[in-house]
A protein has these predicted regions:
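C-terminal functional module detector
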Residues: 1-3, 177-330
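Residue-level recognition of the N-termini of beta-strands and the immediately preceding loop/turn
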Residues: 169-170, 271
């Protein structure tokens, strides 16, 4: 398997963006991305020349659309056909989710706590979710310098709350990218760990997101591995099999500080790596990049999930810099 750098929330002038698909793809390639999802508001017309743009830029483009309603915005990825969003009301979002899943697509909550009307029509999520198993992911980091923004902190907490309830859903970032104007702030990246193979990269990216093989960062890519009695589990995996009560997990946290290194800057510092779970903080360790990977032994009993977080200072602010998606425990 290999990691690819992705941007999962973008717009062109086919909705409210100020860029063509070619400009968007060229800009993404220049920033070190391997793949984007085009998610224009309520239209897929911007994808008409997708294959040509992919050939010209060398960037892979996932098909998608942002359902933009009065009751919330929902990003759909991996769909091939337009789905009419207009009949979905606040109490029947599951009808829309079913249509997306019938196409083999994924559905994610976009910026669920961004201020809504009249500032941004429908940006605040108000749909009633009856079954969280039908939500594939939450966009917990939205726009640039995402982790310092209150609405994103709430979205991250929402994701954690659902993990604590036993649901298994991914967490992503999304720039909500509308133009090629310089960001001026740190840009986050969603890394997807895709299978090797002959299938189109975009199909493998959708599968990776569906499986929760996701790591999100403002800079270095964080990875997590658990070894229990010789069985190795990675991000998105489910620890199952014989009863592991009373056993210890050998946990390894890795960080690659070379990825896209020309596109981000962190001052020299000791970073804090935190292992989080439904039981709270399992372990915290301070380390310089040269001291990685770090290792810990963690009791398995009572665990539903585990993720790694990297904390440090960026642009003078101490904040969450990177996080992995979860490893789950059956």
């Amino acid at each position: 398997m290999t990691w690819i750098a992705c941007e999962l929330h973008t717009h062109t002038f086919h909705s409210d963006g100020k860029q063509s698909l070619t400009e968007l793809a060229s800009g993404a390639k220049a920033l070190g991305f391997d793949c984007i999802a085009l998610t224009d508001h309520n239209t897929m017309t911007g994808l008409a020349h997708k294959e040509q743009v992919e050939r010209e830029t060398g960037l892979s483009i996932m098909s998608g659309m942002e359902w933009t309603t009065f009751f919330g915005h929902m990003v759909t990825i991996g769909i091939n056909d337009y789905q009419d969003w207009r009949k979905v009301g606040p109490e029947d979002i599951h009808a829309g989710l079913a249509r997306v899943h019938e196409q083999g697509g994924l559905a994610g909550m976009a910026h669920p706590f961004r201020p809504g009307s009249p500032m941004c029509t429908g940006c605040y999520w108000e749909f009633e979710i009856g079954d969280w198993n039908e939500i594939d992911y939450i966009e917990v980091w939205s726009t640039t310098f995402a982790p310092v923004k209150k609405n994103n902190i709430r979205a991250y907490r929402l994701w954690t709350d659902q993990l604590n309830k036993g649901f298994r859903l991914a967490a992503t970032s999304g720039r909500d990218w509308h133009s090629q104007e310089p960001a001026g702030e740190p840009v986050s990246v969603t890394y997807l760990r895709i299978n090797e193979g002959e299938a189109p990269l975009t199909d493998r990216a959708v599968e990776a997101l569906s499986s929760g093989r996701v790591s999100v960062t403002l800079g270095p890519r964080l990875d997590l591995e658990v070894n229990i009695d010789g069985d190795v589990y990675r991000i998105g995996d489910v620890v199952s099999g014989p009863d592991k009560t009373g056993r210890l997990a050998a946990v390894q946290v890795m960080a690659d500080f070379t990825v896209r290194h020309e596109h981000w800057h962190l001052p020299e510092q000791r970073f804090t790596i935190s292992l989080q779970s439904n039981l709270g903080v399992l372990s915290e360790m301070a380390a310089l990049p040269a001291q990685l990977p770090l290792h810990a032994e963690i009791p398995v009993q009572g665990l539903l999930w585990m993720r790694a977080e990297l904390w440090g200072v960026i642009q003078g602010v101490r904040t969450l810099i990177a996080f992995t998606n979860a490893i789950y425990f059956a």
